[in-house]
Amino acid sequence: MNASQENLWPAPFASKSLDATVVVPGSKSLSNRYLILAALGHRPVRLVGLLRSRDTELMMDALRSLGVRCEIDEQVDTTVTVVPPSDGRFHGGTKVFCGLAGTVMRFVPGLAMFADGPV
């Protein structure tokens, strides 16, 4: 054993098997990506456990401006149903406010390419 190994901290471990459920908080980055993927579909998608943050609100607003419905569950606000435009095309002739949301700035221009007019 060398000198650096002698100073290692021994990690704790369970003395027996564990059976537990852990609720992990939502991820802003993943939540925005799920919203985009749902918007690209052909039918409504129900997202459960979505992180509600300024960035995800900006993403939902951007999608709404493109004609996507984002319906927030009245009972559980982390459940959102995303309904793509019924005609399958994103709507143009609109402006998108990105705020400081990098995911919105990176991904929405790609979606705008599929719009039926300038965005």
Show which residues each predicted segment covers.
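Short, structured segments at the rim of ligand-binding sites
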Residues: M1-V119
